[in-house]
Amino acid sequence: VTNIERETKMSGSSHSKGVLTLAGFLGGQFAQEKPLAVSAQLTFEQNYGGVDGDSASSAELYALLSSLADVPLKQNLAVTGSINQKGEIQPIGGATEKIESFFDLCEAKGLNGGQGVIIPNQNVDDLMLKEEIIAAVEAAKFHIYSVKTVAEGIELLTGMNCGKREPDGKYTQGSVFHKVQQKLEKYNQSIEAAQIASSQHMDDNASEYEED
């Protein structure tokens, strides 16, 4: 996984560590039998001021999983939270401020009952929210979801089952992780076919050289 912010020296060490961690998670979930046959690039479009902190690492992972699975993510939910290589969501700073900022944006556009924020479970007890937000949550006009794992987050964002690894190494049929696994297997097959074709081409050239 290429962190474009890091390559352009616009990423702090904490953000770079978060990207490396999500790459480790992907490897642990989908590269137990074969290496990951995929190259991905992450960037914050039209960002010119630099990026630091790992609180976006869970959102970055969800975006990668969405792309690999060809499954769209809900755009009415904001996400914050860092991850570890086990797929556990870890606490972040400024949770209250992040919720309030997204709430203000949603309120300005009009609350429709579908908007909300996904935060780490460990941050729940530290929230100091405005009465206005509490009232909106109680009225089901705005939602705050706490998650402990990547699996919980991806299910909220897609409305689909994340999937569990079966004894045969495959993920649950039709799940998000199963779709990711299928895409990666397709990439592997394409690479293997290209390697075979390249090897055959080299053998043919060698045979022609010997005949000459």
Which residues are covered by each model-predicted region?
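Peripheral, non-AAA+ core regions of ATP-driven protein-machinery
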Residues: 1-10, 14-212
